[in-house]
């Protein structure tokens, strides 16, 4: 299995994990359920961990596909830059989520509202960045989604 295979296998996890966690967190906030909010924090931590191999296999995947017909090196570079920004955002989200979990377990208290709000904002940013990165990545092999595509 090549880096391209692994990258394609895992590349939806950062996007879907961020969005799923955001939905769970939003639901927990609406229900005022600390347990649901803590579940979303766990989702963000797991997503952050699984984002690492996605990012690390990106260069190997780029090397494999860069010589294929119809593949744009410029789009690969755009995707790489977007992926770096997204990776940093998701890792920050995961670290803050882990910190919030640790603080709530240590103090045996409910999550503070500022913690939940901070994670919510980071999750929205990470989800948006993930969608942006995925959109650029999709253009690498799917010419039909590139700007200016005509039949």
Where are these regions (language model features)?
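Polytopic transmembrane helical bundles with strong interfacial aromatic enrichment
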Residues: 1-151
